[in-house]
Amino acid sequence: AYYCFCEKAESEEDSGDFDRAEDPCRCLSQQEVAAQLAAGKPYVIRQKIPHTGTTTFSDASFGEITVENSTLDDQVLMKRDGLPTYNFANVIDDHLMGITHVVRGSEYLSSSPKYNLLYEAFGWEIPTYIHCSPVMRDAQHKMSKRHGDPSYEDLKAQGYLTEAILNYVALLGWSPRGELAEQEFFTLEELVQAFDITGISKSPAIFDLEKLNYFNSAYLKALSPEAFLAVAEPYLKQGITNPSIDLRLVAPLVQTRLNTLTEIPPMVDFFDRLPEYSNTLYLHKKMKTNEENSLEALQLVVPVFQAMTEWSFQAIHDALLHLAEAQGLKNGRIMWPVRVAVSGKATTPGGAVELCHILGKEETLRRVQQGIRQLTPQA
């Protein structure tokens, strides 16, 4: 190392970005250094990198890497304010903490030779380096919180399960080997057992939100009914404030239809309040329904519902199917108009029977009768 009294910007001090061949301080004698110090001239302390030869280091992911010493700069070790630079402090801190493996981004590969020269200068054992390629948001840009890319906390707030995030992120830039090579889903314990440094990729991985959605959807579907209700309940309550709606009945309807938990509120809000809707929802090519025959279907349904003494899923199912059969109609000719009338939506979690069962007899009849009024031509 040597004292450097040259006037340089602080950024130059930190980066070591200068032409050391022309730096007069590199070759100052002890007497010249003493004179400068006695004069109170500010200084930094730089690492004296050899001009010739090579420095070789081994990386567990990238293998053995050799660089020409002539390409390395004389990095600053101590700044003018007397504080160590990050690189210098990092080496000392890692040694004092007994760090055996240094895992960091591949952008730090170029710094490793200078780290090694410091370890060698101190006579310390060089740790194992594992440089990992960055996670990219696209082919050109790294993921960055500064540019709006999500953190773990952001993903949690967006309705992703911890287990799904962990599983997906573990497979970014790493892949299992051997008999596990084709396996996609891992518990944390399985990841611990399967992980091997040799599986780390040298190429950057691109963060694919659709793939994360795939993982999250699979994890949501795999939850037991009780476990799913526990994670979904806060979101169900955002969409449904009516205490008469049994969330335990709603939860199974949405569990298999989700990518994220935040999709739940707009999916179930019609249970709380019937939205305004267009009569065009009654038009369904496959079900062969239109406004006219939908009106007829709802008018047939009202007395059937009114006469029912048991309001269960099976009772509603049997009553509607019996009505369709008695009228010589396909089931869809009855089911679709009822579904639209009670939900006001083109797509719903669950069909007509499930929705009517959850809404209850009184609310179902109120909505069906409202549908009749809406479909009835005005004189």
Write out the residue ranges for each language-model feature.
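Active-site cores that bind ATP or allylic diphosphates and position pyrophosphate for catalysis
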Residues: 1-131, 136-143, 151
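Amphipathic alpha-helical segments within well-ordered protein domains
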Residues: 116, 152-153, 213-216, 233, ...
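Conserved phosphate-binding loops in nucleotide/dinucleotide-binding enzymes
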Residues: 78-80, 97-108, 136-168, 172-180, ...
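Small-residue-rich helix-loop
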Residues: 225-327
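Structural motif
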Residues: 155-163, 202-208, 241-250, 325-333
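Short alpha-helical scaffolding segments that buttress acidic/His motifs in well-ordered protein cores
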Residues: 168-169, 195, 216, 251-258, ...
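Charged substrate- and nucleic-acid-binding regions of tRNA-handling and nucleotidyl-transfer enzymes
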Residues: 314-376
